[in-house]
């Protein structure tokens, strides 16, 4: 008999320092009104000494505490991130060491703002195999270290944070449908972290450490391609938008959510948002949003609600999941 997987616990963690739009206006030519009207963002949390693995480890500890599990009972840890502490060891390996999950294998998954959705899909397959019983899936980012703080077109958008879930094997299906996609042909529209150095054998070099984005292209991609895939997902599951209690989307821009809701014919209230507090936290945005929705009582994790989750971003990548929570 095929095993299934369910989200049994959620948690998130934000660094303490808050940088408001007014704070940014003191550093560059911008204003709170300019940022809010174009993005819906009012502030963001920024690390001052913590690393991505520190944020992810805080989430892992919270998940263990909530579930009353010992770290030795975790079979695997997947961390979705584009801002790792180092190329190696992986951020997930650092988390494994930090919490003492001696029996868990751990690795990072890189899919930018789609990372958490891709990681959830991967983890569900691991549990469905019947080999593993439970794992931690975490999205964590310190994007403040990848931002050019003199470029207002990107500096105002991003923040730091982490969120995650405990995924456990179960008997009833809760992952109802999924569509994961990549279009590398459009990858140049959103890039970061390019660091190609000269060697004794090659004089080619290219360094572009900061996030660079073609804003209009990304907006069109999200509102056209991702929205169409969400509709396709519902059709695949033989469901309509009325069957979905909430749509949890990557928190990139309030205008994107507004246009998606209109195109799908869904009440905007079904699209919870927290970007006003945190900005765009890439792979961390969806698990942070999910955790806050559970904390507020909007979502119950009792199997009675259907949510559509969608991540989209660099790659270009996008992924959609239909979940029974």
Curated annotation (Swiss-Prot):
Protein name in UniProt: Beta-ketoacyl-[acyl-carrier-protein] synthase III
Localization terms from the record: Cytoplasm
Tagged with keyword Transferase: yes
Highest taxon of source: Bacteria
Main location: cytoplasm
Species in which this protein is naturally found: Streptococcus suis (strain 05ZYH33)
Pathway the protein acts in: Lipid metabolism; fatty acid biosynthesis
Family: Belongs to the thiolase-like superfamily. FabH family.
Region ranges (ACP-binding): 251-255
Reaction(s) this enzyme catalyzes, per UniProt: malonyl-[ACP] + acetyl-CoA + H(+) = 3-oxobutanoyl-[ACP] + CO2 + CoA
Key words, A-Z: Acyltransferase, Cytoplasm, Fatty acid biosynthesis, Fatty acid metabolism, Lipid biosynthesis, Lipid metabolism, Multifunctional enzyme, Transferase
This protein's GO CC annotations: cytoplasm
Stated role: Catalyzes the condensation reaction of fatty acid synthesis by the addition to an acyl acceptor of two carbons from malonyl-ACP. Catalyzes the first condensation reaction which initiates fatty acid synthesis and may therefore play a role in governing the total rate of fatty acid production. Possesses both acetoacetyl-ACP synthase and acetyl transacylase activities. Its substrate specificity determines the biosynthesis of branched-chain and/or straight-chain of fatty acids.
CDD domains on file: KAS_III
GO term, biological process aspect, one: fatty acid biosynthetic process
Gene assigned in the entry: fabH
């Amino acid at each position: 008999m095929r095993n299934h997987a369910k989200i049994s616990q959620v948690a998130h963690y934000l660094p303490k320092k808050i940088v408001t739009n007014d704070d940014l206006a003191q550093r560059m030519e911008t204003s709170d009104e300019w940022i809010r009207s174009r993005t819906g963002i009012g502030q963001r949390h920024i690390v001052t000494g913590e690393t991505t693995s520190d944020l992810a480890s805080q989430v892992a500890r919270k998940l263990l505490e909530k579930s009353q599990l010992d770290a030795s009972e975790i079979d695997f840890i997947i961390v979705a991130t584009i801002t790792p502490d180092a190329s190696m060891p992986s951020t997930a390996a650092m988390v494994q060491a930090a919490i003492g999950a001696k029996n868990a294998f751990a690795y990072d998954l890189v899919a930018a703002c789609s990372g958490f959705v891709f990681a959830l899909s991967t983890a569900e397959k691991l549990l469905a195999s019947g080999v593993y019983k439970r794992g931690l899936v975490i999205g964590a980012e310190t994007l403040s270290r990848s931002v050019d703080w003199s470029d207002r077109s990107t500096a105002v958008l991003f923040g730091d944070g982490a969120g995650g879930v405990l995924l456990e094997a179960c008997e009833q299906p809760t992952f109802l449908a999924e569509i994961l996609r990549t279009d590398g042909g459009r990858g140049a529209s959103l890039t970061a972290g390019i660091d190609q150095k000269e060697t004794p054998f090659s004089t080619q070099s290219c360094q572009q450490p900061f996030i660079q984005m073609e804003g209009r292209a990304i907006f069109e991609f999200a509102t056209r391609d991702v929205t169409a895939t969400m509709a396709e997902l519902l059709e695949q599951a033989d469901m309509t938008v009325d069957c979905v209690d909430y749509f949890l989307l990557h928190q990139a821009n309030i205008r994107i959510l507004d246009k998606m809701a209109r195109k799908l014919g869904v009440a905007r209230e079904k699209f919870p948002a927290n970007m006003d507090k945190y900005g765009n936290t890439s792979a961390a945005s969806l698990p942070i949003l999910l955790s806050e929705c559970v904390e507020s009582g909007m979502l119950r994790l009792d199997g009675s609600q259907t949510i559509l989750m969608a991540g989209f971003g660099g790659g270009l990548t996008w992924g959609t999941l239909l979940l029974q929570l």
